[in-house]
């Protein structure tokens, strides 16, 4: 008769399995995949086209755009997208999503810089034109003066100014960092 030690007696079949994933960890992974799916649904079609996705997943995301949010059908569809995301490698999608979202924030930051330049030009006039032309020699001083003068006149009449928009477009097209 062989005596079995306590450790052998209470040993479970999964104790030696190195690839064992607990239910809690599996649920966390599923929820993370569903959150990535929700982020994908929030993207526009052009942004979504920049991310390489499985055809079935892409079609499901497009269908989610057609369903009204805050409905039971939308919630079920989001769970379905989460289910599809579990069968796809999520890491490359997360990386592509970060690139798309970061590119948008970089574009917004650039536009804000041009907006501030325009505001300084309109408030300070010739001194700011001189500073900008020294900093960016590709700018045409005469064109800047004309646009600033017209925009200042139009802003005195009303808040929306065609020349102010032209000044913004000119700065954006000429200054490319």
Curated annotation (Swiss-Prot):
Transmembrane segments: none annotated. This is Dual-action ribosomal maturation protein DarP. CDD domains: YjgA-like. One of its GO terms (molecular function) is ribosome binding. GO terms for biological process: assembly of large subunit precursor of preribosome. One of its GO terms (cellular component) is cytosol. It comes from the Bacteria. Residues 1-26 are annotated as: Disordered. The lineage of its organism: Bacteria, Pseudomonadati, Pseudomonadota, Gammaproteobacteria, Alteromonadales. Belongs to the DarP family. It is found in: Cytoplasm. InterPro entries: DarP, DarP_sf. Keywords: Cytoplasm, Ribosome biogenesis, RNA-binding, rRNA-binding. The keyword RNA-binding applies.
């Amino acid at each position: 008769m062989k005596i079995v030690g306590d450790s052998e007696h209470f040993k479970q079949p999964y104790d030696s399995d190195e690839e064992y994933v607990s239910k809690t960890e599996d649920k966390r992974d599923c929820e993370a995949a569903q959150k990535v799916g929700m982020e994908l649904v929030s993207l526009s079609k052009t942004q979504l086209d920049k991310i390489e996705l499985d055809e079935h997943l892409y079609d499901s995301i497009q269908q989610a755009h057609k369903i009204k949010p805050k409905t039971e059908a939308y919630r079920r569809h989001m769970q379905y997208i989460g289910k599809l995301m579990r069968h796809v490698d999520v890491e490359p999608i997360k990386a592509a999503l970060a690139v798309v979202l970061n590119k948008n924030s970089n574009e917004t930051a650039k536009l804000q810089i041009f907006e501030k330049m325009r505001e300084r030009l309109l408030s300070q006039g010739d001194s700011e034109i001189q500073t900008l032309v020294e900093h960016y020699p590709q700018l045409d001083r005469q064109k800047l003066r004309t646009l600033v003068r017209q925009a200042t006149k139009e802003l005195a009449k009303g808040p929306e100014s065609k020349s102010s928009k032209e000044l913004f477009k000119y700065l954006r097209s000429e200054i490319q960092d």
